[in-house]
Amino acid sequence: MFKPQSIYYEKEIENYELGKELLEKYKDVPKVIIENHNNIEEMRKKENDEFPKMKQNLIIGIRKTHKFVENHKTSDFLVPYTSSGCTAMCLYCYLVCNYNKCAYLRLFVNREQMLEKIIKTAQKSEKNLTFEIGSNSDLILENTITNNLVW
């Protein structure tokens, strides 16, 4: 099971039930308050060889954009959902070279807002829609931390 070495979090997560739960769950893990989960300067400055160490961090924030991308290959929409990134260290991973800032697991605590947008989009449609929520994250890993799959 994943146990983070440090947690970087947006202060606003304290206003969400899941945010409170995660801070309590990891109360003994060192924490750093950040302005934005998407721009952690300390992480952006790290060299690629620090990739394995970066994987030991957990970032907790609020997903601010809920943009659905039309897909039409495996679903109607690709939906950024309750997490992004992972904790694995696959040798072929493109994140280390291209997105050092995203080499770690990010969890988003505003799951109610994200689910609400999916539901509203589906209700507006005249046909049944398929939303792919797992293409940019590891929902199984995430579930071991958040228990989000019940959602």
Language model segments and positions:
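Flexible, acidic/Gly-rich N-terminal and inter-domain linker regions that tether
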Residues: 1-76
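Short gly/ser-rich anion-binding loops that grip negatively charged ligand groups
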Residues: 76-83, 104
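A structural signal for short, well-ordered beta-strand segments and their strand-loop junctions
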Residues: 8, 33, 79, 91, ...
